[in-house]
Amino acid sequence: MLAGVRREEDGEKLLAESHHERLRYAVIDITDDTSVRASAELVAHRYGGLRGLVNNAGICLPGPLECIDGEQFRRQLDVNVVGHLSMIRAHLPLLRRSHGRIVNVTSGLGSAAVPFLGAYSAAQFAKEALSDALRRELAPTGVRVSVVAPGAILTPIWTKVSQAGERALADAPPAVADLYRSALQGFLEGNAQQAMASRTTPEDFARTVLRALTDARPRARYWAGADARRMARTARLLPDSLLDRTFRAITAQVGAPAGTDARP
């Protein structure tokens, strides 16, 4: 098993915390084609082949779309979508040889676009479409493609998300930031509370990914967490007008003074 990490220290920490004797790591920047090609060459030459590729790298940039500039939006797509496609393209020759699996990790937000997570939702929708197209294109070659969509899981990402949301407001014109500040603060606090209350653990997520890699007949989609499954079902069944009403509580305090209770 080869884990891709951004930094050497991340890889060493992973090895120290893992009890898997066969776990190794490689430093990979999925937004750099040279780094991605080096990863594929390492797998081919050192390990001789590849049975499965799990694309789990991602960033989440929260905030009103009015506060997210083009460079930030492109970064969201570059990491969460383009980088995943680069990894797939580089490793496909190995996967075709083994009739292997590709597992793309998306999110419950690949089913419905939530206010203040528009950039992230756009990336997840794109990754869902990417996965659907790949699944159909690669089926004749024996390479199977699945999506795993986790819901809220208590991990350090939520602290990073809150900090990124605060930076998005800090970088926006003051009048624009003031318009959204109260609503966004309430939204970020609600997200953190939802993650703390979630019963889905990282181990639950890992088991779901393992199923996608090993099921005799892998499904197109797997969900890790009741909230992710509920989001997908709600988005599929409700008309847009009712979905808009469902999310109205999030934006109810847009325009309210900072510190106002964000509940409607």
Regions found by a protein language model. Give the residues of each.
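C-terminal beta-strand-loop-alpha-helix "lid" module of Rossmann-like NAD(P)-dependent dehydrogenases
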Residues: 140-195
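Conserved glycine-rich Rossmann-like NAD(P)H-binding loop of the short-chain dehydrogenase/reductase
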Residues: 1-12
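A short, exposed helix-loop element centered on a Lys and neighboring polar residues
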Residues: 88-89, 132
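Active-site helix of classical SDR
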Residues: 88, 123-126
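Substrate-binding pocket helix/loop in short-chain dehydrogenase/reductase
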Residues: 64-65, 72-74
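The beta1-alpha1 cofactor-binding region of Rossmann-like NAD(H)/NADP(H)-dependent oxidoreductases
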Residues: 28-41, 70
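Residue(s) in the substrate-gating loop at a strand-loop-helix junction
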Residues: 107
